[in-house]
Design a protein with these regions (language model features):
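Short functional linear segments
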Residues: 5-60, 67, 73, 77-78
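ATP-dependent carboxylate-amine ligase catalytic core
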Residues: 29-36, 40-51, 77-163, 179-181, ...
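Conserved catalytic-core segment of NTP-binding enzymes
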Residues: 155-157, 164-213
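Short, conserved beta-strand segments within well-ordered enzyme catalytic domains
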Residues: 57-59, 83, 203
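Residue-level preference for the first positions of well-ordered beta-strands
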Residues: 55, 145-146, 201
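Residue-identity detector for glycine
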Residues: 1-2
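Walker A/P-loop phosphate-binding motif and the immediately C-terminal alpha-helix
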Residues: 71-72, 171
Length: 213
């Protein structure tokens, strides 16, 4: 038997993503599903595509988007086939997932959701987890050599923290998403610092004496 499910077009696919998968914009804090269990299980189902290329992980409050875009641009200019995953998007969901500056094709988004619909529903993936897995998978299919991956929220429990990067970057920390990440700079810094991994170099933005100790 099994399911018969056919997505007709890109717009319907987006409708599914934004409605069936809880989005932070719509639901607020309850949409924030910290933890790596679901994304780990789903990426395993995909064959762990995120392990097939080098990654650079970027977290922080201020400037992480700009830093991510600059890094991708520099890598591309240096001749590397480069993936870039950022959020949120301005006009089109596909702005989040770029290879050498080009957005993921609409058909790739449709095919991915159609193919993995059952598993995503079963695992109860959040909108961001789904987007992250799509990026990981598309970068692998596109034979990228290196991908710049920006965290969605925080770092420690962020879906992107599944990757083992060649370097982690933490830009300046500020008070944002305090209800989710903590209400003081050190607490937020601790969440962002969650992307730091043993034996992986880290580059940090402006040093702040308050975080020493």
């Amino acid at each position: 038997g099994g399911r018969y499910f056919c997505i007709m077009n890109y717009n319907q696919t987006l409708e599914f993503l934004f409605s069936s998968l809880v989005s932070y914009q719509e639901k607020g804090p309850e949409a924030y599903k910290p933890g790596l269990e679901r994304i780990t299980a789903f990426c395993k189902h995909l064959g762990n595509p995120q392990r097939n290329y080098f990654t650079i992980h970027v977290a922080g409050t201020n400037g992480k988007g700009s830093v991510s875009h600059m890094l991708a641009s520099v890598l591309q200019q240096a001749g590397y086939r480069t993936g870039l995953y950022t959020s949120p998007h301005l006009r089109d969901f596909r702005e989040r997932i770029l290879v050498d500056g080009e957005m993921i094709p609409k058909q790739k988004v449709v095919n991915f959701v159609d193919k993995h619909y059952d598993c995503m529903k079963e695992l109860g993936l959040s909108f961001f987890e789904m987007s992250t897995a799509l990026a990981f998978d598309y970068f692998d299919q596109s034979d990228v050599e290196v991908a710049v991956i920006e965290t969605g929220l925080g770092g420690r429990l962020d879906a992107t923290n599944l990757i083992i990067p060649i370097v982690s970057v933490i830009t300046n920390i500020g008070l944002e998403h305090t209800s989710l990440l903590g209400d003081t700079l050190p607490k937020i810094a601790a969440e962002k610092a969650g992307i730091i991994k043993k034996s992986i170099p880290v580059i940090i933005g402006e040093a702040d004496a308050r975080f020493n100790g």
